């Protein structure tokens, strides 16, 4: 018999309730997807073009400048720079994302029984 803090009353022991920790996987996955998408978008849209011009005149997208003492003629950037081809990659990326997002839905539709609409193996109980 144990005493509680010298009062003479027996200590009441309560059972510990065990609860699983909160499941934060959806929140972490959402944050990770957002960070990854923003990094990809940032890397595809940043300016990787070489510096053209001097400290006063900058022509990163092509053009010409003529004044009394100097002239500069620069062509626009070629298509080999990824920042100028951002929209060319959009349809394949969008198609891949839509494909992977619809796969769980299509997989559950294919495995459902056409008689009882339950997901299980071969439907042998409806003969």
Swiss-Prot record:
One Gene Ontology cellular component annotation held by this UniProt entry: membrane
Bilayer-spanning residue ranges: 25-45, 86-106
Taxonomy, superkingdom: Viruses
Cytoplasmic membrane side: 1-24, 107-127
The keyword Transmembrane appears for this protein: yes
Positions on the Lumenal side per record topology: 46-85
Chief place of localization: host cell
Compartments reported by the entry: Host endoplasmic reticulum membrane
UniProt key word Transport: yes
Alphabetical UniProt keywords: Host endoplasmic reticulum, Host membrane, Membrane, Transmembrane, Transmembrane helix, Transport, Viral movement protein
Pfam families reported in the protein's UniProt record: Plant_vir_prot
Record-level GO BP terms: transport of virus in host, cell to cell
Family from the record: Belongs to the Tymovirales TGBp2 protein family.
Other remarks on this protein: TGBp1, TGBp2 and TGBp3 seem to act together for cell-to-cell propagation. TGBp1 is the main movement protein that physically cross the plasmodesma with the viral genome. TGBp2 and TGBp3 would facilitate TGBp1 function.
Function: Plays a role in viral cell-to-cell propagation, by facilitating genome transport to neighboring plant cells through plasmosdesmata,.
Protein name: Movement protein TGB2
Species this protein is from: Foxtail mosaic virus
């Amino acid at each position: 018999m144990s005493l509680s803090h010298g009062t003479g009353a027996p200590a009441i022991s309560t059972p510990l309730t065990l609860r699983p920790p909160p499941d934060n996987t959806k929140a972490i996955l959402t944050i990770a997807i957002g960070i990854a998408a923003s990094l990809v978008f940032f890397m595809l849209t940043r300016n990787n073009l070489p510096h053209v011009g001097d400290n006063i005149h900058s022509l990163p997208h092509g053009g010409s400048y003529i004044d009394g003492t100097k002239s500069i003629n620069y062509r626009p950037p070629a298509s080999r720079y990824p920042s100028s081809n951002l929209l060319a990659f959009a349809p394949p990326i969008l198609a891949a994302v839509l494909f992977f997002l619809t796969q769980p839905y299509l997989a559950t539709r294919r495995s459902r029984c056409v008689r009882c609409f339950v997901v299980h193996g071969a439907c042998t109980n409806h003969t």
